[in-house]
Amino acid sequence: AYPGSHISGPNGFXMDVK
């Protein structure tokens, strides 16, 4: 939801974190 707020998930996809 926020630019640059993406982390690698357990499945290798980006997850939105504040």
Swiss-Prot record:
Keywords tagged on the record: Glycoprotein, Lectin
Top-level taxon of the source organism: Eukaryota
GO molecular function: carbohydrate binding
Residues that span the membrane, as ranges: none
Post-translational note: N-glycosylated.
Subunit structure: Homodimer.
Its job: Lectin that binds galactose, galactose-containing sugars and gentiobiose. It is strongly mitogenic for human T-lymphocytes and induces the release of interleukin-1 beta and tumor necrosis factor alpha from cultured mononuclear cells. It has a strong hemagglutininating activity.
Protein name: Galactose-inhibitable lectin
Provenance organism: Euphorbia marginata (Snow-on-the-mountain)
